[in-house]
Amino acid sequence: VQTCALPIFYHRSYWSPRVTGFLRRFDHCNIALLIAGTYTPLAIALLEDPRALLIIIWSCAAGLIAFRLLWMGAPRWLYTPLYIVMGCIAVAYLPVFWPVSSAATVALSVGGIAYIAGAVVYALKRPAIAPLHFGFHEVFHSCTVIGFVCHWSAIVVAMSA
């Protein structure tokens, strides 16, 4: 809930610079938590022994959280690919996921593509469809909603497989 509610809370109000800085840090750290939190039920449901993947992904999450807490001013071109790399670790596991649940694997893949498209939009700051009302940031969040729905669907399907 927090990973979805915080961006709305953060973006829908005007805050003091101090509060904005805190919310921005929290928002960026939540991305790593969302990625690792998505991997966790999928790994448990689809892998015979999920320990290696869970250690890798939660270590990545801890590292990314520390990185964003310590260097919030890092350039967009540096930190955005780190989230993409963390998300793409799943590619190595797709052949193992497929025989257990092809539907979950497809939903996971489509969601990953949506998230990557959103990350590219965020990194490039374009396209801005209607700059005053629906800019690149709204396109980015639209992609993340699509990715979230696909990944939630993958988790539901995998947990019932």
What residue spans do the PLM features occupy?
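Multi-pass alpha-helical transmembrane bundles in non-GPCR membrane proteins
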Residues: 3-161
